[in-house]
């Protein structure tokens, strides 16, 4: 387990679009040193950008690595996924040990969007992983800062 905990790790997720309220996005990043960076920009009703940074315990980082590893996202390829478009884009970059992978696709509203793609199984894995990571990040941020992230 000590070797697993010392494994190189980095994860960055971004989802956003440029619309009538400007550049609206959600982005978070887990770093190997335990830092979690979070940014949420919504210009709706003149909201301002929310930026938060916290340091996580090794146990939380280990859980994040487990979530990524068990999702098997590192075996996927985004070549047959929908290209980012005017509706928006999602990016996911992961470094886990000696593996480094980066994905870019359009925004996914629901599982129906996954089923209509050329790679429904791969996109479904991506969709569920992103949902799990967002849930984890929102919980960590709201517990730490006592704010509502969205």
UniProtKB/Swiss-Prot annotation:
Keywords: Acetylation, Cytoplasm, mRNA processing, mRNA splicing, mRNA transport, Nonsense-mediated mRNA decay, Nucleus, RNA-binding, Translation regulation, Transport. GO terms for molecular function: RNA binding. One of its GO terms (biological process) is pollen tube guidance. Disruption phenotype: Male sterility due to pollen abortion after meiosis. Its main location: nucleus. The modification N-acetylalanine is found at residue 2. Gene3D superfamilies: Mago nashi (3.30.1560.10). The keyword Phosphoprotein does not apply. The keyword Acetylation applies. Pfam families: Mago_nashi (PF02792). Expressed in root and shoot meristems, cotyledons, vascular tissues of leaves, receptacle of flowers and siliques, and pollen grains. It is found in: Nucleus, Nucleolus; Nucleus speckle; Nucleus; Cytoplasm, P-body. GO terms for cellular component: exon-exon junction complex; nuclear speck; nucleolus; nucleoplasm; P-body. Core component of the splicing-dependent multiprotein exon junction complex (EJC) deposited at splice junctions on mRNAs. The EJC is a dynamic structure consisting of core proteins and several peripheral nuclear and cytoplasmic associated factors that join the complex only transiently either during EJC assembly or during subsequent mRNA metabolism. Belongs to the mago nashi family. This is Protein mago nashi homolog. The gene is MAGO.
């Amino acid at each position: 387990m000590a070797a697993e905990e010392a494994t190189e790790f980095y994860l960055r997720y971004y989802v956003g679009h440029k619309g009538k309220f400007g550049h609206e996005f959600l982005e978070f990043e887990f770093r190997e040193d335990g830092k979690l960076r979070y940014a949420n920009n919504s210009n709706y009703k003149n909201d301002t950008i929310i930026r938060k940074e916290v340091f996580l315990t090794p146990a939380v980082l280990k859980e994040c690595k487990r979530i990524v590893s068990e999702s098997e996202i590192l075996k996927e390829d985004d070549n047959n996924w929908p290209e980012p478009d005017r509706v928006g884009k999602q990016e996911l970059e992961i470094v886990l040990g000696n593996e480094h992978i980066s994905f870019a696709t359009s925004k996914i509203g629901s599982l129906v969007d996954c089923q209509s793609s050329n790679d429904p199984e791969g996109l479904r894995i991506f969709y569920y992983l992103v949902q799990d990571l967002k849930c984890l990040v929102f919980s960590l941020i709201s517990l730490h800062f006592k704010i509502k992230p969205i």
